[in-house]
Amino acid sequence: VRAVRDMFFPGKGKVVASVPWCTFTDPELAHAGMTEAEARAQHGDDVDVWRQDLAHNDRARADGTTAGAIIVITHKKRIVGAHILAPAAGEMIHELALAIEEGVGLSELSQFTHVYPTVSTSIGRLAGEAAFEKAGRLSWLVKRR
């Protein structure tokens, strides 16, 4: 069905915004989806930006490559943009590009198991910390005895 649709309506089948790209520098710079500025222009202040520095990653520390970070932009709990500055960022961005395309949120992404120790465990750590922080923001809903 997609092949026929794309044949008659080229460009309609793929969401170009979620297509990842990478600049192969040292460290690599990879991106998918919206930048923070684009997300704020489209969604206003209903945007959250989450950051995980590689200084907290065991593999990066072991390799001596702690310069870098993973940044994820969300709107209404869904990932709308991702940026990675890290060794092998071009290999790690695919997970976040798929999350953008499929409308996955950080809480769902936090359930994914990453191989340890790899730099990509920082994606899981970012997702877990973001989900935990979001849950903490709702703690006022819970009645205490």
PLM region spans:
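Flexible, glycine-rich terminal cap/loop adjacent to redox cofactors
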Residues: 6-8, 12, 19, 24-145
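Conserved core segment of the aminotransferase class I/II
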Residues: 1-5
